[in-house]
């Protein structure tokens, strides 16, 4: 095994000297044994001349000193894969962090893998039911597709992801992989305890590199989670869900180490390799003829600016976008999905059918008309509208409230039991509201209910 010595340490970036002709390959993992018995993993990033490599540390470099011995493992970072990782919480290098003993994995995968070949890809377009009305109706997710949850701070991205994990595990008994990339440790802890309580933990693998971790871990933990998901797809022929919270932090971590690695910054100070790094990750998330990896990625939007290079680069890869809006959250409508801003590639009559498509378009049309009338209402008041427009506004407000829904994972906040609404129930409910069947019901009856029958029941108590 080749051995080198640390020659320089600058924050998370460590330079290591090796004998001439024994340089580790790019992306190979190096290991440092610390005096306290723990080890630190480094990943080779650059060759500087004949005898020196520049690496990025996956853990804090506290306690490292120049001259320490560094061992070349001769291969990239390996992630444990298979049934043994279900119900466990791992870090970026595959070590358990849940205090429940070693991981019983029969096999490991390199975290750097090439995307499936073109001939192995599946091109079938198929909808994936989530049980969340606003998503299933207006921006249906595709099986094996990529979906982005866009939103600023505190509009509900993580809660929506937790609800999706809950619905998939309970309704479809599918496997999920959750990669926590640079988010709050408290949220990871809450997620872990809620999964233990609800029993979905046995079908989920969790991989975390949170805010307190060095940028090396945050830039690689999404790849570790992806490798675990790829194993279930390629070797067990399963349909897997991959949740990444938050893909923006993946880019942010890359930009933190980029300058230390000596690269020139590009627009807004991001790394020049932004599009390449994002492409390498996103290209591996796909459906093959054997199985699929369906991904839902939370995307933090810095300062609510969708044109920032990080969210804009992610946009290009997505099949569906769910945009969470602060103005809708302020109305108290949760999930705070913007029905007019969110899109889906498969909202097409040839894929979802005419009934679904027509209902979705009618909902969008009535909401858009309401939006157009809001300026007039603000200036002149409701009384100045024509009778026809008054009816549009009344129905649109009911539709807007009916797009809200009580979540299983938010029962503690709302005091209401969660609801999973089947697609046909969703379509039926919205069709009836738009057709005017429920014009006599108060609009509050439609707020935080599941099916249209529940709204009718609720109206009786108001």
Swiss-Prot record:
<dbReference type="InterPro" id="IPR036121">
    <property type="entry name" value="ATPase_F1/V1/A1_a/bsu_N_sf"/>
</dbReference>
<dbReference type="InterPro" id="IPR004100">
    <property type="entry name" value="ATPase_F1/V1/A1_a/bsu_N"/>
</dbReference>
<dbReference type="InterPro" id="IPR027417">
    <property type="entry name" value="P-loop_NTPase"/>
</dbReference>
<keyword id="KW-0066">ATP synthesis</keyword>
<dbReference type="InterPro" id="IPR005722">
    <property type="entry name" value="ATP_synth_F1_bsu"/>
</dbReference>
<keyword id="KW-0472">Membrane</keyword>
<keyword id="KW-0406">Ion transport</keyword>
<keyword id="KW-0813">Transport</keyword>
<dbReference type="InterPro" id="IPR050053">
    <property type="entry name" value="ATPase_alpha/beta_chains"/>
</dbReference>
<keyword id="KW-0139">CF(1)</keyword>
<keyword id="KW-0997">Cell inner membrane</keyword>
<dbReference type="InterPro" id="IPR003593">
    <property type="entry name" value="AAA+_ATPase"/>
</dbReference>
<comment type="subunit">
    <text>F-type ATPases have 2 components, CF(1) - the catalytic core - and CF(0) - the membrane proton channel. CF(1) has five subunits: alpha(3), beta(3), gamma(1), delta(1), epsilon(1). CF(0) has four main subunits: a(1), b(1), b'(1) and c(9-12).</text>
</comment>
<comment type="similarity">
    <text>Belongs to the ATPase alpha/beta chains family.</text>
</comment>
<dbReference type="InterPro" id="IPR055190">
    <property type="entry name" value="ATP-synt_VA_C"/>
</dbReference>
<keyword id="KW-1003">Cell membrane</keyword>
<dbReference type="GO" id="GO:0005524">
    <property type="term" value="F:ATP binding"/>
</dbReference>
<comment type="function">
    <text>Produces ATP from ADP in the presence of a proton gradient across the membrane. The catalytic sites are hosted primarily by the beta subunits.</text>
</comment>
<dbReference type="InterPro" id="IPR024034">
    <property type="entry name" value="ATPase_F1/V1_b/a_C"/>
</dbReference>
<dbReference type="InterPro" id="IPR020003">
    <property type="entry name" value="ATPase_a/bsu_AS"/>
</dbReference>
<dbReference type="GO" id="GO:0016887">
    <property type="term" value="F:ATP hydrolysis activity"/>
</dbReference>
<keyword id="KW-1278">Translocase</keyword>
<dbReference type="InterPro" id="IPR000194">
    <property type="entry name" value="ATPase_F1/V1/A1_a/bsu_nucl-bd"/>
</dbReference>
<dbReference type="Pfam" id="PF02874">
    <property type="entry name" value="ATP-synt_ab_N"/>
</dbReference>
<dbReference type="GO" id="GO:0046933">
    <property type="term" value="F:proton-transporting ATP synthase activity, rotational mechanism"/>
</dbReference>
<keyword id="KW-0547">Nucleotide-binding</keyword>
<dbReference type="Pfam" id="PF00006">
    <property type="entry name" value="ATP-synt_ab"/>
</dbReference>
<dbReference type="GO" id="GO:0005886">
    <property type="term" value="C:plasma membrane"/>
</dbReference>
<keyword id="KW-0067">ATP-binding</keyword>
<dbReference type="Pfam" id="PF22919">
    <property type="entry name" value="ATP-synt_VA_C"/>
</dbReference>
<feature type="binding site">
    <location>
        <begin position="151"/>
        <end position="158"/>
    </location>
    <ligand>
        <name>ATP</name>
    </ligand>
</feature>
<protein>
    <recommendedName>
        <fullName>ATP synthase subunit beta</fullName>
        <ecNumber>7.1.2.2</ecNumber>
    </recommendedName>
</protein>
<dbReference type="GO" id="GO:0045259">
    <property type="term" value="C:proton-transporting ATP synthase complex"/>
</dbReference>
<keyword id="KW-0375">Hydrogen ion transport</keyword>
